[in-house]
Protein backbone atom coordinates (compact mmCIF):
# COMPACT_ATOMS: atom_id res chain seq x y z
CA UNK A 1 0.00 0.00 0.00
CA UNK A 2 1.02 3.62 -0.42
CA UNK A 3 1.59 4.00 3.34
CA UNK A 4 3.71 0.84 3.72
CA UNK A 5 7.05 0.92 5.51
CA UNK A 6 8.83 -0.13 2.30
CA UNK A 7 11.11 -2.83 3.74
CA UNK A 8 11.97 -5.64 1.31
CA UNK A 9 13.16 -8.85 2.94
CA UNK A 10 13.69 -12.06 0.98
CA UNK A 11 13.66 -14.85 3.54
CA UNK A 12 10.27 -16.38 4.31
CA UNK A 13 9.07 -19.56 6.01
CA UNK A 14 9.08 -21.72 2.86
CA UNK A 15 11.08 -22.05 -0.32
CA UNK A 16 8.14 -21.00 -2.50
CA UNK A 17 7.45 -17.83 -0.49
CA UNK A 18 11.16 -17.00 -0.44
CA UNK A 19 11.29 -17.48 -4.22
CA UNK A 20 8.49 -14.92 -4.57
CA UNK A 21 10.36 -12.33 -2.52
CA UNK A 22 13.68 -13.03 -4.24
CA UNK A 23 12.08 -12.19 -7.57
CA UNK A 24 10.74 -8.95 -6.08
CA UNK A 25 14.29 -7.92 -5.18
CA UNK A 26 15.57 -8.68 -8.68
CA UNK A 27 12.69 -6.72 -10.19
CA UNK A 28 13.17 -3.70 -7.95
CA UNK A 29 16.91 -3.64 -8.61
CA UNK A 30 16.40 -3.34 -12.35
CA UNK A 31 13.01 -1.74 -12.96
CA UNK A 32 14.30 1.84 -12.84
CA UNK A 33 16.61 1.09 -15.77
CA UNK A 34 13.57 0.30 -17.92
CA UNK A 35 11.30 3.14 -16.82
CA UNK A 36 13.84 5.85 -15.92
CA UNK A 37 11.77 6.36 -12.75
CA UNK A 38 13.39 6.08 -9.34
CA UNK A 39 11.72 3.81 -6.77
CA UNK A 40 14.20 4.65 -4.05
CA UNK A 41 15.69 1.14 -4.10
CA UNK A 42 18.51 0.84 -1.58
CA UNK A 43 20.18 -2.53 -1.05
CA UNK A 44 21.04 -1.68 2.53
CA UNK A 45 20.61 -5.22 3.87
CA UNK A 46 18.55 -6.27 6.85
CA UNK A 47 19.27 -7.43 10.37
CA UNK A 48 17.16 -9.69 12.59
CA UNK A 49 18.02 -9.31 16.27
CA UNK A 50 17.87 -12.05 18.90
CA UNK A 51 17.48 -11.21 22.61
CA UNK A 52 16.79 -14.64 24.12
CA UNK A 53 18.35 -18.10 23.98
CA UNK A 54 15.20 -19.42 22.35
CA UNK A 55 15.30 -16.71 19.71
CA UNK A 56 18.94 -17.44 18.92
CA UNK A 57 18.11 -21.11 18.38
CA UNK A 58 15.40 -19.99 15.99
CA UNK A 59 17.82 -17.61 14.23
CA UNK A 60 20.36 -20.41 13.82
CA UNK A 61 17.64 -22.34 12.04
CA UNK A 62 16.82 -19.21 10.03
CA UNK A 63 20.42 -18.91 8.82
CA UNK A 64 20.52 -22.59 7.89
CA UNK A 65 17.19 -22.32 6.09
CA UNK A 66 18.41 -19.27 4.18
CA UNK A 67 21.33 -21.27 2.83
CA UNK A 68 18.98 -24.00 1.59
CA UNK A 69 16.74 -21.39 -0.06
CA UNK A 70 19.66 -19.63 -1.76
CA UNK A 71 19.54 -16.45 0.34
CA UNK A 72 22.77 -14.89 1.59
CA UNK A 73 22.67 -14.89 5.39
CA UNK A 74 25.21 -14.78 8.20
CA UNK A 75 24.78 -15.48 11.90
CA UNK A 76 26.59 -12.68 13.77
CA UNK A 77 27.26 -11.80 17.41
CA UNK A 78 26.07 -8.80 19.39
CA UNK A 79 29.12 -6.65 18.63
CA UNK A 80 28.74 -7.13 14.89
CA UNK A 81 25.06 -6.23 15.20
CA UNK A 82 26.17 -2.94 16.73
CA UNK A 83 28.61 -2.39 13.87
CA UNK A 84 25.71 -2.69 11.44
CA UNK A 85 23.61 -0.13 13.37
CA UNK A 86 25.99 1.99 15.51
CA UNK A 87 23.21 4.30 16.71
CA UNK A 88 21.31 1.55 18.52
CA UNK A 89 22.08 -0.09 21.85
CA UNK A 90 22.98 -3.77 21.79
CA UNK A 91 22.07 -4.25 25.44
CA UNK A 92 20.32 -7.59 25.86
CA UNK A 93 21.10 -8.64 22.29
CA UNK A 94 22.78 -12.03 22.00
CA UNK A 95 23.25 -11.97 18.25
CA UNK A 96 21.43 -11.74 14.97
CA UNK A 97 21.13 -12.76 11.34
CA UNK A 98 22.59 -10.45 8.69
CA UNK A 99 20.97 -10.56 5.22
CA UNK A 100 23.06 -8.34 2.91
CA UNK A 101 20.88 -8.59 -0.21
CA UNK A 102 17.69 -7.21 1.37
CA UNK A 103 16.72 -3.58 0.91
CA UNK A 104 14.06 -0.89 0.98
CA UNK A 105 11.98 1.16 -1.47
CA UNK A 106 9.63 4.12 -1.46
CA UNK A 107 6.16 2.52 -1.90
CA UNK A 108 4.49 5.37 -3.79
CA UNK A 109 7.35 5.59 -6.28
CA UNK A 110 7.30 1.81 -6.73
CA UNK A 111 3.56 1.84 -7.47
CA UNK A 112 4.01 4.56 -10.09
CA UNK A 113 6.88 2.67 -11.68
CA UNK A 114 4.97 -0.63 -11.85
CA UNK A 115 1.98 1.19 -13.32
CA UNK A 116 4.16 2.69 -16.06
CA UNK A 117 5.57 -0.74 -16.91
CA UNK A 118 2.05 -2.14 -17.12
CA UNK A 119 0.85 0.69 -19.37
CA UNK A 120 3.89 0.29 -21.61
CA UNK A 121 2.83 -3.33 -22.10
CA UNK A 122 -0.76 -2.51 -23.05
CA UNK A 123 -2.52 -2.54 -19.67
CA UNK A 124 -5.33 -0.01 -19.19
CA UNK A 125 -5.55 1.58 -15.74
CA UNK A 126 -8.73 3.39 -14.68
CA UNK A 127 -8.48 5.73 -11.70
CA UNK A 128 -11.27 7.38 -9.72
CA UNK A 129 -13.54 4.41 -10.39
CA UNK A 130 -15.21 1.99 -7.98
CA UNK A 131 -16.22 -1.64 -8.39
CA UNK A 132 -19.83 -2.03 -7.28
CA UNK A 133 -20.05 -5.78 -7.79
CA UNK A 134 -18.54 -8.80 -9.49
CA UNK A 135 -20.54 -10.12 -12.43
CA UNK A 136 -21.29 -13.84 -12.16
CA UNK A 137 -23.65 -16.25 -13.90
CA UNK A 138 -23.93 -19.97 -13.15
CA UNK A 139 -20.69 -19.86 -11.10
CA UNK A 140 -18.78 -18.20 -13.96
CA UNK A 141 -17.33 -14.77 -13.25
CA UNK A 142 -17.24 -12.68 -16.42
CA UNK A 143 -16.31 -9.19 -15.26
CA UNK A 144 -17.21 -6.36 -12.90
CA UNK A 145 -19.87 -3.69 -12.63
CA UNK A 146 -18.32 -0.29 -11.89
CA UNK A 147 -19.82 3.12 -11.25
CA UNK A 148 -18.86 3.90 -14.86
CA UNK A 149 -20.21 0.77 -16.53
CA UNK A 150 -19.36 -2.90 -17.06
CA UNK A 151 -15.89 -4.30 -17.72
CA UNK A 152 -15.93 -7.86 -19.07
CA UNK A 153 -12.96 -10.21 -18.95
CA UNK A 154 -11.89 -13.83 -19.17
CA UNK A 155 -10.35 -13.58 -15.69
CA UNK A 156 -11.29 -11.32 -12.80
CA UNK A 157 -8.59 -10.92 -10.16
CA UNK A 158 -9.50 -9.71 -6.69
CA UNK A 159 -6.37 -7.91 -5.54
CA UNK A 160 -8.15 -5.22 -3.58
CA UNK A 161 -6.37 -5.68 -0.28
CA UNK A 162 -8.66 -5.09 2.68
CA UNK A 163 -11.60 -4.57 0.29
CA UNK A 164 -11.22 -8.12 -1.04
CA UNK A 165 -13.38 -9.82 1.59
CA UNK A 166 -16.49 -7.74 0.96
CA UNK A 167 -16.13 -8.12 -2.81
CA UNK A 168 -16.07 -11.88 -2.36
CA UNK A 169 -18.93 -11.92 0.15
CA UNK A 170 -21.28 -10.33 -2.36
CA UNK A 171 -21.00 -13.41 -4.62
CA UNK A 172 -20.72 -16.03 -1.86
CA UNK A 173 -16.91 -16.36 -1.92
CA UNK A 174 -15.27 -16.39 1.51
CA UNK A 175 -11.92 -14.55 1.57
CA UNK A 176 -10.62 -14.79 5.15
CA UNK A 177 -8.97 -11.45 5.83
CA UNK A 178 -9.85 -8.29 7.72
CA UNK A 179 -8.50 -4.74 8.16
CA UNK A 180 -6.21 -4.09 11.12
CA UNK A 181 -4.69 -0.80 12.21
CA UNK A 182 -0.94 -0.76 11.62
CA UNK A 183 1.19 2.00 13.09
CA UNK A 184 4.61 3.51 12.60
CA UNK A 185 6.24 6.82 13.43
CA UNK A 186 8.93 8.84 11.67
CA UNK A 187 11.36 10.78 13.81
CA UNK A 188 13.19 14.00 13.19
CA UNK A 189 16.84 13.76 12.15
CA UNK A 190 18.90 11.63 14.54
CA UNK A 191 22.65 12.15 14.81
CA UNK A 192 24.62 9.33 13.20
CA UNK A 193 21.72 7.97 11.15
CA UNK A 194 22.38 7.61 7.42
CA UNK A 195 20.25 6.39 4.53
CA UNK A 196 22.36 3.25 4.08
CA UNK A 197 21.76 1.70 7.50
CA UNK A 198 20.05 -1.71 7.23
CA UNK A 199 16.42 -2.46 7.98
CA UNK A 200 16.16 -3.99 11.46
CA UNK A 201 13.60 -6.37 12.92
CA UNK A 202 13.49 -7.33 16.59
CA UNK A 203 10.89 -10.10 16.86
CA UNK A 204 11.20 -10.45 20.64
CA UNK A 205 9.86 -6.89 20.97
CA UNK A 206 7.72 -7.10 17.80
CA UNK A 207 9.27 -3.92 16.37
CA UNK A 208 11.08 -2.93 13.20
CA UNK A 209 12.96 0.19 12.18
CA UNK A 210 14.75 1.65 9.18
CA UNK A 211 16.58 4.87 8.43
CA UNK A 212 15.18 7.67 6.31
CA UNK A 213 17.08 9.56 3.62
CA UNK A 214 17.02 12.71 5.76
CA UNK A 215 18.51 10.96 8.81
CA UNK A 216 15.24 10.22 10.55
CA UNK A 217 14.09 6.82 11.81
CA UNK A 218 10.93 4.98 10.81
CA UNK A 219 9.82 2.83 13.76
CA UNK A 220 6.89 0.44 13.58
CA UNK A 221 5.57 -2.53 15.46
CA UNK A 222 2.93 -5.13 16.03
CA UNK A 223 0.84 -5.99 19.07
CA UNK A 224 -0.16 -9.28 20.69
CA UNK A 225 -3.75 -8.04 20.60
CA UNK A 226 -4.50 -6.42 17.26
CA UNK A 227 -6.85 -3.52 16.69
CA UNK A 228 -9.39 -4.42 13.99
CA UNK A 229 -10.98 -1.68 11.88
CA UNK A 230 -14.32 -1.83 10.03
CA UNK A 231 -14.40 -5.62 9.87
CA UNK A 232 -17.88 -5.88 8.35
CA UNK A 233 -17.62 -3.35 5.55
CA UNK A 234 -15.24 -0.53 4.69
CA UNK A 235 -16.90 2.88 4.13
CA UNK A 236 -17.34 3.73 0.46
CA UNK A 237 -15.58 7.07 0.82
CA UNK A 238 -12.44 5.60 2.40
CA UNK A 239 -9.60 5.85 -0.11
CA UNK A 240 -6.03 7.11 0.27
CA UNK A 241 -6.76 8.11 3.84
CA UNK A 242 -5.10 7.48 7.18
CA UNK A 243 -6.71 6.94 10.57
CA UNK A 244 -6.18 9.15 13.59
CA UNK A 245 -2.95 8.62 15.56
CA UNK A 246 -3.31 6.33 18.57
CA UNK A 247 -0.33 7.00 20.83
CA UNK A 248 -1.80 4.95 23.69
CA UNK A 249 -2.04 1.82 21.57
CA UNK A 250 1.44 2.42 20.16
CA UNK A 251 2.95 2.83 23.64
CA UNK A 252 4.60 -0.61 23.83
CA UNK A 253 6.35 -0.52 20.41
CA UNK A 254 7.44 3.06 21.07
CA UNK A 255 8.93 2.17 24.46
CA UNK A 256 10.72 -0.82 22.94
CA UNK A 257 12.07 1.36 20.15
CA UNK A 258 13.35 3.97 22.59
CA UNK A 259 15.16 1.29 24.60
CA UNK A 260 16.81 -0.05 21.47
CA UNK A 261 17.65 3.42 20.10
CA UNK A 262 18.30 5.66 23.13
CA UNK A 263 18.45 8.85 21.04
CA UNK A 264 14.71 8.48 20.41
CA UNK A 265 14.10 9.22 24.11
CA UNK A 266 14.49 12.95 23.54
CA UNK A 267 13.44 12.98 19.91
CA UNK A 268 10.40 14.59 18.30
CA UNK A 269 8.32 12.53 15.89
CA UNK A 270 7.31 14.44 12.79
CA UNK A 271 4.79 11.89 11.56
CA UNK A 272 2.48 9.20 12.97
CA UNK A 273 1.10 6.84 10.33
CA UNK A 274 -1.97 4.80 11.25
CA UNK A 275 -2.96 2.94 8.11
CA UNK A 276 -5.30 -0.06 8.01
CA UNK A 277 -3.93 -3.16 6.29
CA UNK A 278 -5.36 -6.59 5.54
CA UNK A 279 -4.37 -9.55 7.71
CA UNK A 280 -5.22 -13.25 7.47
CA UNK A 281 -5.72 -15.86 10.23
CA UNK A 282 -2.54 -17.81 9.43
CA UNK A 283 -0.43 -14.75 8.50
CA UNK A 284 0.01 -16.00 4.92
CA UNK A 285 -1.36 -14.19 1.89
CA UNK A 286 -4.17 -15.66 -0.18
CA UNK A 287 -3.35 -16.67 -3.74
CA UNK A 288 -5.42 -18.89 -5.99
CA UNK A 289 -8.82 -19.75 -7.44
CA UNK A 290 -11.76 -20.07 -5.02
CA UNK A 291 -13.48 -23.48 -5.20
CA UNK A 292 -16.76 -23.66 -7.07
CA UNK A 293 -16.17 -20.44 -8.98
CA UNK A 294 -14.69 -20.17 -12.48
CA UNK A 295 -12.94 -17.15 -13.94
CA UNK A 296 -12.02 -15.71 -10.53
CA UNK A 297 -8.57 -15.43 -8.93
CA UNK A 298 -7.71 -13.99 -5.51
CA UNK A 299 -4.43 -12.29 -4.59
CA UNK A 300 -4.81 -10.44 -1.30
CA UNK A 301 -4.13 -10.36 2.44
CA UNK A 302 -0.39 -9.71 2.53
CA UNK A 303 -0.01 -9.09 6.27
CA UNK A 304 2.41 -6.14 5.98
CA UNK A 305 4.72 -7.84 3.46
CA UNK A 306 2.91 -6.61 0.36
CA UNK A 307 5.82 -4.51 -0.91
CA UNK A 308 8.32 -7.33 -0.38
CA UNK A 309 6.10 -9.91 -2.10
CA UNK A 310 4.40 -7.82 -4.79
CA UNK A 311 6.90 -8.36 -7.59
CA UNK A 312 7.07 -12.13 -7.26
CA UNK A 313 3.39 -12.60 -6.46
CA UNK A 314 2.44 -10.70 -9.60
CA UNK A 315 4.86 -12.73 -11.71
CA UNK A 316 3.69 -16.14 -10.51
CA UNK A 317 0.01 -15.20 -10.55
CA UNK A 318 0.30 -14.16 -14.20
CA UNK A 319 2.11 -17.39 -15.07
CA UNK A 320 -0.56 -19.38 -13.23
CA UNK A 321 -3.31 -17.77 -15.32
CA UNK A 322 -1.45 -17.83 -18.64
Whereabouts are the PLM-identified features?
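Flavin-dependent oxidoreductases
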Residues: 9-11, 15, 134-245, 252-265
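Glycine-rich FAD pyrophosphate-binding loop
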Residues: 1-2
Amino acid sequence: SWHAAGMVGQLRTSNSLTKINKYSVELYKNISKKTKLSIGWNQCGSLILGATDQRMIQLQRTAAMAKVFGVNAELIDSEKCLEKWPVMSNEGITGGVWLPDDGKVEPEKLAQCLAKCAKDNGVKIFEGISVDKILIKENLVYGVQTNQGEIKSEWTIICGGMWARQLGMDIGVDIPLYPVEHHYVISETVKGVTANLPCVREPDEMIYFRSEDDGGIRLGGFQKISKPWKVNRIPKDFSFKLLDPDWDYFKQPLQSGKRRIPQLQDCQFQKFVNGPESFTPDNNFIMGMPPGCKGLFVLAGFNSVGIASAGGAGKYASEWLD
